[in-house]
């Protein structure tokens, strides 16, 4: 009988392979707008067992992001996310949380979004590297947008140390976003965006690491021609800097 780790590795590999047929390639673009941006992220995951042994399966997620557009010169978005998780095993956990996003458009008032999210998080250490799969469902309450938008996000991450027991590692990940319903004024059911990242990670210790690299963000921004199914697209070239804490 195959070992449990081998089975988990196969499941995660199949999950990742399913992203190869990305939805973005199936959508013809009418126009493409590009920008260089800077995203900063701090994410902390705390295990509550250190406070009370009876809470050893419970987790807390705290995250803060700052995003800057126009070559990184102007604030674009601020995001705060918090959640509570429960460990089903050493490699699987389920989560429920809330996020608030403030968007700062040019020549317009700040737009606010309140978001409820649920996710399943899977991790595995394979012989060829570390794998992470995150499936997240969101209910987005966006100012001046109706009805509530439902969105599915699938994230797959791979990392591998540059040499045995090295603190420095190669990090690759991809995340696909799909709208599960249509909303007004212009968001339609289907592909929303894709984010792909390539960079380096450095582990200061088992509890802290930083990841720096290039993220490509492809966004289907609005409908141009419903008859021809054409859309405006935006491509953002992003310098991504993230700090992760395991407490």
Regions found by a protein language model. Name each.
Residues 51-60, 91-96, 127-131, 165-169, ...:
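Repeated loop/turn-to-beta-strand initiation elements of outer-membrane beta-barrel proteins
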Residues 130, 134-225, 245-247:
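Outer-membrane beta-barrel transmembrane domain signature
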Residues 41-43, 81, 117-119, 155-157, ...:
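Membrane-embedded beta-strand positions in outer-membrane beta-barrel channels/transporters
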Residues 24-28:
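N-terminal signal peptide c-region/cleavage motif recognized by signal peptidases
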Residues 120, 233-247:
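Outer-membrane beta-barrel "beta-signal"
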Residues 31-39, 68-77, 107-111, 142-148, ...:
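Solvent-exposed loop/turn segments connecting transmembrane beta-strands
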Residues 29-74, 244:
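Short glycine/proline- and aromatic-enriched beta-strand/turn motifs that initiate or cap beta-hairpins
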Residues 46-48, 86, 122-124, 160-162, ...:
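Residue-level signature of outer-membrane beta-barrel architecture
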